[in-house]
Amino acid sequence: MKIELYIAQLLYRYQCVTVPGLGAFLTEIQSAQVNESLNFFSPPKKRIAFNANLKNNDGLLANHIALAEKTSYEYAVSAIQYEVFNWKKALEENEVLPLKNIGELRLNADKNIVFTPYDQTN
């Protein structure tokens, strides 16, 4: 199951999407920017950050998956746990973990998760 697709969907509607056992993706709206000297305008956009300290299941992601997949909440929780297990394994093997329409996760030298958001998706 590609839970990153569900995370991306939820990030359009909510400021915080917690992935139990991994961390939380947080959004912040960045105002439009005007640079008069360059005649440049950039529209408002959402910026995505990641907090590895927020790991408890708040139910948002699991409920969303259960509704979308027409399955039980318990099955959705177990699917998330399985995916998180695989993600952590990939990170520990020094892999970059791309999450479609969200960004990339990797471990730094101190084994902390580092998140790099994709800028092309608003």
Regions found by a protein language model. Name each.
Residues 1-122:
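Cytosolic/nucleoplasmic/matrix-facing N-terminal domains/tails
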